[in-house]
Amino acid sequence: MDTILLFMLPAGLWAQDAGVAATTAAPDATAGALGELATGLNTVWMLLAAMLVFFMQPGFALVEAGFIRTKNTANVLMKNLVDFMFGSILFWFIGFGLMFGIGGFVGAPHFFNLEAMDKIIDNGLPIEGFLIFQTVFCATAATIVSGAMAERTKFSMYLVYTVFISVLIYPVSGHWTWGGGWLMNGDEGSFMMRTFGTTFHDFAGSTVVHSVGGWIAWVGAAILGPRIGKYGKDGKSRAIPGHSLTLACLGVFILWFGWFGFNPGSQLAAATSGDQTAISHVFLTTNLAACAGGFFALVASWMKYGKPSLSLTLNGVLAGLVGITAGCDLVSPFGSVLIGAICGVVMIFAVDFIDHVLKIDDPVGASSVHGACGCLGTILTGLFATEEGLFYGGGSSFLLAQLFGAAVVGVWAAGMGFIVFKVLDKIHGLRVPKRIEEEGLDIYEHGESAYN
């Protein structure tokens, strides 16, 4: 009997070891499955957000088409189409590596080498999905310029501009911020930490996307000069109405819808309850800012001009959306209403100042909506952020960091835009001949009209 027990003992011990191994393996397998599920949810959310941001492209096209005359509609639609097509290829080929590669001032480029970029970024998301998400943001910055330079720009020169913003201007300043560069480097001893004790914050792109496009639009419109007939001999501005506020209104609603991918999608995760709470908060602050921007622009235009202007109210909605994009994750719902309201009112006066004082002809108000309000919204985040904001007892450090970051990116974008457009103007001329401008760009540039 003792002999039998002696032989059974190792078998019993082996069975216990197998049980322990099975018990250990089960949690590991469960954890792995949950990890894969979380990655899947995050990926689907990111790609869904990318689709929403892509849908902003027809929104921009309709807004710009509505704010210009019929004879130039096909031209502006073509520019919105082409900057996405060109920009997508160029950003994949060069811009993505410059923006997210390793480096302080600019990332080391890995030309169309997504395998190398995947090892560098390592954010748990498929690299191809992350690329397409970032591509639609780059395309947004590029297309902002189209409206400001509408009705008088050579199509060929616009294509050249698209190359520069997609492979250089946007990726470099994007690297400083979202690419782990010096403006958002929180390491001890980094420039921002030594200077301000905190880093620059731009959650979804008030500065990184919108003010970059807005400042380039402002510089481009200034170099290009006003449309024929915009200013009289006495220097007074003359209104040149767009041909369809219906299209413009539809475009704004599409942009508003797309912004629910632009801002909440920048969370880049949706698997945990914390992610879902953050996404919901950003949805709310984004919508409230849009509503406040539109409402206060309506009131301001009513008080200033005697009647509530639809075109200015539409731009007020966009101003609120642009303004809240930097701090939509940090501010309270009340703070988002204040940011939207301030941006909506400031947009009215920025349009007036640029048009009547600076004498810069911006047919759609892009430099006011995206440039001025993108910069302003970034700065207001330093006031209304509930943890570090000045109005919440956070001191001035965060506000100063926001001011500095917005200024640096603005100078970069405006400076590079000035160089690009000046060189193009000297080499080949930015502007179409006077006769073509008077007859319209649709037939001259494309051989077809938007309306028959």
Name each model feature, range by range.
Residues 1-18:
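N-terminal secretory/membrane targeting signals
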Residues 14-452:
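Glycine- and aromatic-enriched membrane alpha-helices
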